[in-house]
């Protein structure tokens, strides 16, 4: 009986080792483990015969059975490790990046002419000591008109059509509204540049758009004069357009007094580029500033107009068409 069990154990080990060696997946290896070493596995079935052995024979068979079990466990662990390593190696081989292969070509983008114009203008004003200020595009009537010396019955309201919202608010018609917000929150002296989108009910054509961009500057301090305003604008124009002739023409804006428009001589003709003036005392009073102590000046211009002049664009609508043939020129 002893020799029979020894033979069965040796045959089991030989068969199991061969099967483990041939296993090519972790699932197949687990199936072999259950088949040979599980509670109902082949080794357990053989060991059931130990009950028929004499007490003196059992230690020998038990020791042999443990040797077989340990050999199979070691074989299973080694094979499992080998399969894991092979899987990792295969994955690495499949995911290896050949750095000598050409990459996917991604064409370089271009800065939109509106963005480049805004960036250039703001860089100039920041260099002059101005702070960038932002404000909401949806405004109240107070900030867009009344605080800027334009009450409901003021005739200047007829100068521009406005997009009114159902709740009584409106889409701002100029970035001048930003100066009111800023002055309410800051004590003078102040110097700000306020860029942003504006909205007016204009009929779109080659020079007008319902949505456009504007930059407004504001300076408030003791002793500021129109000479300071002219000097600031001259420096700005020179850095934007170069050494070109400029002229100031008397004009009217409800929130500045006196007011002026500025023209530059460009390509042999005069072009209007911005409006400016000294801040009206009523505007200063509306934000709690004493106009007897402080004076200020403001200027504003349309970014689209500047971009069209700088890049010789003949139609404002080209700036919004997303035509790559046009945009790739910049």
UniProtKB/Swiss-Prot annotation:
Cofactor: Mg(2+)
Chief location bin: cytoplasm
Annotated EC: 6.1.1.20
Compartment(s) where it occurs, according to its Swiss-Prot or TrEMBL record: Cytoplasm
GO biological processes: phenylalanyl-tRNA aminoacylation
Reaction catalysed by this enzyme: tRNA(Phe) + L-phenylalanine + ATP = L-phenylalanyl-tRNA(Phe) + AMP + diphosphate + H(+)
UniProt-annotated binding residues for Mg(2+): 257
Gene Ontology molecular function, alphabetical: ATP binding; magnesium ion binding; phenylalanine-tRNA ligase activity; tRNA binding
Enzyme class: ligase
Keyword set includes Metal-binding: yes
PROSITE patterns, sorted: AA_TRNA_LIGASE_II (PS50862)
Cofactor note (record): Binds 2 magnesium ions per tetramer.
A single GO cellular-component term on record: cytoplasm
Keywords of this entry: Aminoacyl-tRNA synthetase, ATP-binding, Cytoplasm, Ligase, Magnesium, Metal-binding, Nucleotide-binding, Protein biosynthesis
Keyword Ribonucleoprotein among UniProt keywords: no
Cystine pairings recorded for this chain: none
Source organism superkingdom: Bacteria
Pfam families linked to this entry: Phe_tRNA-synt_N, tRNA-synt_2d
The protein's assembly and partners: Tetramer of two alpha and two beta subunits.
Family from the record: Belongs to the class-II aminoacyl-tRNA synthetase family. Phe-tRNA synthetase alpha subunit type 1 subfamily.
The protein, known as: Phenylalanine--tRNA ligase alpha subunit
Lineage summary: Bacteria, Bacillati, Cyanobacteriota, Cyanophyceae, Acaryochloridales
Gene that encodes it: pheS
């Amino acid at each position: 009986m002893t020799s029979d069990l020894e033979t069965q154990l040796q045959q089991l080990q030989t068969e199991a080792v061969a099967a483990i060696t041939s296993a090519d997946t972790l699932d197949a290896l687990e199936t072999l483990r259950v088949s040979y070493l599980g509670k109902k596995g082949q080794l357990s079935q053989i060991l059931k015969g130990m009950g028929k052995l004499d007490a003196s024979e059992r230690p020998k068979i038990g020791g042999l059975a443990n040797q077989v079990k340990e050999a199979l466990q070691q074989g299973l662990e080694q094979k499992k490790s080998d399969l894991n390593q092979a899987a990792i190696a295969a994955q690495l081989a499949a995911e290896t990046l050949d750095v000598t292969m050409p990459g996917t070509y991604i064409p370089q983008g271009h800065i939109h002419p509106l963005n480049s114009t805004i960036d250039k203008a703001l860089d100039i004003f920041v260099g002059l000591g101005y702070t960038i200020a932002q404000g909401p595009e949806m405004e109240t009537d107070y900030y867009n008109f009344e605080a800027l010396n334009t009450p409901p019955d003021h005739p200047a309201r007829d100068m521009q059509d406005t997009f009114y919202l159902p709740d009584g608010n409106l889409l701002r018609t100029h970035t001048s509204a930003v100066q009111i917000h800023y002055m309410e929150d800051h004590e003078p002296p102040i110097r700000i540049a306020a860029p942003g989108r504006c909205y007016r009910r204009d009929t779109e054509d080659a020079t007008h758009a319902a949505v456009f961009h504007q930059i407004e500057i504001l300076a408030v301090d003791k002793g500021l004069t129109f000479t300071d305003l002219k000097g600031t604008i001259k420096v700005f124009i020179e850095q934007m357009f170069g050494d070109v002739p400029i002229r100031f023409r008397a004009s009217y804006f409800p929130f500045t007094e006196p007011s002026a428009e500025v023209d530059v001589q460009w390509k042999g003709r005069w072009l209007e580029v911005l409006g400016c003036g000294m801040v009206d005392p009523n505007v200063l009073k509306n934000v709690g500033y004493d106009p007897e102590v402080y004076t200020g000046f403001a200027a504003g211009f349309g970014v689209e107009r500047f971009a069209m002049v700088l890049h010789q664009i003949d139609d404002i609508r080209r700036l919004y068409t997303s035509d790559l043939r046009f945009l790739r020129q910049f």
